[in-house]
């Protein structure tokens, strides 16, 4: 017997799916950079990309982009954010740490008790782990992946509630 909560979640998912798919399909003609620049909730990261001169990395190639939401950046101490802005190499490497070789969709919320860990390489040369486990939000580097699987012309974008620091 389905619990009321599971039944409600299933119904909500069924109702929302056409809207989500339409929105995701609309992104396919855009690059990751265009999507980031048009999304107010990731404006700090858009600023970091521009300040580091990394627009091309977000416009060409095929990558997985893990974009920190503004709320995550706001939780970082102000002095650290200033370091990202003033120390060009630290800022550049931190931004590139959010670009990975993982271009597949992330399957989350399986609900079957299974889990999967995938180690991915970033353009900063680091390795981070994506974890998908049962009914929990998937994570990357320990940070929740809050929005997943926005296909863009040059890869796949995901929003994360954290910053993948070096």
Where do the PLM segments sit?
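Mature, structured domains of secreted/extracytosolic soluble proteins
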Residues: 2, 6-9, 13-166
């Amino acid at each position: 017997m389905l619990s009321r909560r599971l039944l409600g979640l299933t119904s909500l998912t069924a109702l929302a799916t056409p809207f989500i798919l339409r929105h995701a399909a609309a992104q396919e003609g855009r690059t990751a950079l265009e999507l980031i620049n048009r999304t107010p909730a990731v404006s700090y990261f858009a600023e970091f990309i521009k300040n580091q001169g990394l627009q091309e990395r977000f416009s060409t190639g095929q990558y997985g982009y893990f974009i920190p939401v503004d709320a995550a950046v706001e939780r970082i101490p102000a002095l650290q954010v200033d370091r990202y802005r003033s120390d060009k190499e630290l800022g550049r490497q931190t931004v590139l740490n959010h670009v990975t070789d993982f271009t597949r969709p992330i399957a989350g919320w399986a609900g079957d008790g299974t889990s999967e860990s995938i180690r991915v390489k970033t353009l900063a040369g680091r390795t981070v782990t994506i974890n998908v486990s049962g009914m929990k939000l998937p994570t990357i580097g320990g940070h929740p992946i809050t929005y997943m699987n926005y296909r863009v012309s040059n890869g796949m974008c995901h929003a994360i509630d954290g910053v993948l620091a070096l």
